[in-house]
């Protein structure tokens, strides 16, 4: 299964009420968790299965299922990694917390658990950022799927800044620093030597609709807007694009576009823009 299957499932079965969908199957009703469950069903085509069948389908489609504390949210078996982000406002940025944006997911990433690294034989995976706008009534208003390689710069861009900040903090005189994976940690701040201070980085990135506003604008008069961007190399790697192209639906559109290279915006790359609305 891949992103093409997910888009086909969306067009054939446009479920957009994430809370009612999750509650009907006795699943998490927090909006973020419900969106993650929705995405799993979208990729595995398990919307209409009972819970036992759904679990079995997910085990077949995914090699790993994670959560906020154990990234990524999912890995398609022999396929891409998936990171799901929920925002409540159409213009909100994405909070990535302590993890910088990723163009790819590498097996040597220190944020990954052993279970994730051992889920299958892999070295590097493309990562799909899936962003949903869920309103207060738990309706999915907007959904975007973009690949990290088209959305984020290479890791060295972020690590360079992080390391410069960490080095600068460590060079502050008169303070006892401790080893940490964070930006810094100061021990023994008070006379009793019982207080410490952690210095953490909190990463964020603008949402895909903001980043790609030069090629796509949402129609706010529609109840639901979907956008996916797939670069040409990735599109050509799939063997099921003909099934998507064969769908006859006026609400579904596929067009050729050019997008900016995140590492050098002066260079453009060919891509497909897939849109759908209700």
From Swiss-Prot:
It comes from the Bacteria. Disulfide bonds: none annotated. GO terms for molecular function: DNA binding; type II site-specific deoxyribonuclease activity. It catalyses: Endonucleolytic cleavage of DNA to give specific double-stranded fragments with terminal 5'-phosphates. Pfam families: RE_NgoPII. GO terms for biological process: DNA restriction-modification system. Keywords: Endonuclease, Hydrolase, Nuclease, Restriction system. Its EC number is 3.1.21.4. Belongs to the NgoPII type II restriction endonuclease family. This is Type II restriction enzyme NgoPII. It comes from Neisseria gonorrhoeae. The lineage of its organism: Bacteria, Pseudomonadati, Pseudomonadota, Betaproteobacteria, Neisseriales.
């Amino acid at each position: 299964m891949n992103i093409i299957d997910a888009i086909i499932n969306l067009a054939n079965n446009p479920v957009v009420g994430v809370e009612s969908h999750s509650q009907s199957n006795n699943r998490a009703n927090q909006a973020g968790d419900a969106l993650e469950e929705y995405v799993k069903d979208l990729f595995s085509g398990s919307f209409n299965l009972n819970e036992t069948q759904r679990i079995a389908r997910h085990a077949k489609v995914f090699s790993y299922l994670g959560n906020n504390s154990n990234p990524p949210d999912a890995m398609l078996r022999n396929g891409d990694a998936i990171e799901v982000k929920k925002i409540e406002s159409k213009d909100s940025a994405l909070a990535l917390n302590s993890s910088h944006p990723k163009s790819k997911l590498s097996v040597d990433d220190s944020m990954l658990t052993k279970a994730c690294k051992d889920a299958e034989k892999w070295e590097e995976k493309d990562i799909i950022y899936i962003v949903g706008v869920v309103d207060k009534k738990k309706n999915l208003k907007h959904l975007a799927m973009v690949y990290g390689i088209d959305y984020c710069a290479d890791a060295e861009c972020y690590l360079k800044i992080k390391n410069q900040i960490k080095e600068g903090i460590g060079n502050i005189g008169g303070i006892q620093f401790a080893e940490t994976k964070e930006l810094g940690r100061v021990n023994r701040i008070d006379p009793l030597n019982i207080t410490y201070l952690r210095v953490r980085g909190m990463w964020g990135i603008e949402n895909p609709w903001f980043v790609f506003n030069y090629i796509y604008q949402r129609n706010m008069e529609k109840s639901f807007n979907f956008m996916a961007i797939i670069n040409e190399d990735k599109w050509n790697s799939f063997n099921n694009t003909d099934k998507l192209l064969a769908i006859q639906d006026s609400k579904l559109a596929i067009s050729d576009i050019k997008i900016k290279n995140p590492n050098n915006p002066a260079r453009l790359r060919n891509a497909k823009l897939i849109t759908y609305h209700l």
